[in-house]
Amino acid sequence: INVLGILGLLGKALSHL
């Protein structure tokens, strides 16, 4: 599991809200 990758996906999701 890539923590930085997950944080990146979460950041993208939040920016799309």
Curated annotation (Swiss-Prot):
Tissue-specific expression:
Expressed by the venom gland.
- What GO cellular-component annotations does this UniProt entry give? extracellular region
* Signal peptide (from-to): none
What Gene Ontology molecular-function terms does this entry list? toxin activity
User: Where found in the cell?
Assistant: Secreted
What keyword terms does UniProt attach to this protein? Amidation, G-protein coupled receptor impairing toxin, Mast cell degranulation, Secreted, Toxin
- Sites of Leucine amide modification: 17
Q: What is its main location?
A: secreted
Q: What family name appears in the similarity comment? A: Belongs to the MCD family. Bombolitin subfamily.
Q: What does this protein do?
A: Mast cell degranulating peptide. Its mast cell degranulation activity may be related to the activation of G-protein coupled receptors in mast cells as well as interaction with other proteins located in cell endosomal membranes in the mast cells.
* The protein's name in its UniProt record: Bombolitin-5
**Which organism is the protein's source?**
Bombus pensylvanicus
